């Protein structure tokens, strides 16, 4: 029964991915011109994206080391469900109704996939769809402002980059065939530039750089094997660094 359910899930995800590849990326669809989002909306988006990333990283990490923390994954799914309901209520003027329905359906598919025994087949189908969950929400956030290193402007975007980089690294440690190496390198360079700018201002920069250096040293190089324990280092240090950004 479990094998049949897993096969069916793979089929559904393959169909969903095929639909995604045959249509424009959700993040590029039209949004109503309402000006910048509020601080509360930025916080809501980043909270959801963090839970979203923690869930995916936890699933991928359990596949890498063969040990799944089901209680933690269950808790993250519940948190994600609650935050998604808030997103539907608070961002309905930003995302069209049909697009919001697609966003919720994709989140549900990804969340359901994390209930299965981790396999590379599921992960390879799940991760692109997970990006389609994050993309339209990330598109609402302000751009990273390297010059305004000490301010709050762009903080949500930096946290999004951090969460994406965390997922990239953990995924690469498991599958060793990450298809978005260039994107991971771009995120790494952008965050490093911002952290160096913060360090020059001397406000918490030393602590940030210390955590970043630990995180960056665990990131896999292109098509290279991860160091022993690197996936766990990426997850623990990445989540700590996320909170400091």
Describe each model-derived feature in a short phrase:
Residues 2, 8-27:
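N-terminal export signals
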């Amino acid at each position: 029964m479990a094998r049949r359910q897993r096969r069916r899930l793979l089929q559904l995800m393959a169909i969903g991915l095929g639909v995604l590849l045959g249509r424009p990326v959700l993040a590029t669809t039209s949004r109503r011109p309402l000006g910048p989002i509020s601080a509360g909306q930025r916080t809501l988006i980043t909270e959801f994206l963090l839970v979203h990333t923690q869930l995916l990283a936890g699933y991928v990490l359990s596949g890498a080391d063969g040990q799944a923390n089901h209680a933690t994954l269950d808790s993250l799914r519940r948190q994600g469900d609650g935050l998604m309901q808030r997103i539907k209520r608070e961002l309905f003027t930003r995302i069209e109704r049909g697009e919001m329905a697609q966003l919720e359906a994709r989140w549900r598919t990804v969340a359901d996939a994390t209930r299965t025994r981790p396999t590379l087949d599921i992960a390879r189908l799940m991760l692109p769809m997970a990006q389609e969950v994050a993309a339209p929400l990330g598109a609402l956030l302000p751009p990273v402002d390297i010059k305004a290193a000490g301010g709050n402007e762009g903080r949500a975007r930096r946290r999004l980059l951090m969460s994406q980089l965390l997922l990239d690294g953990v995924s690469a440690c498991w599958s060793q065939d990450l298809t978005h190496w260039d994107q991971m390198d771009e995120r790494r360079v952008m965050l490093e530039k911002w952290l160096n700018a913060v360090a020059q201002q001397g406000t918490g920069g030393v602590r940030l750089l210390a955590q970043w250096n630990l995180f960056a040293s665990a990131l896999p190089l292109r098509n290279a094997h991860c160091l022993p324990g690197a996936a766990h280092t990426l997850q623990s240090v990445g989540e700590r660094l996320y909170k400091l950004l």
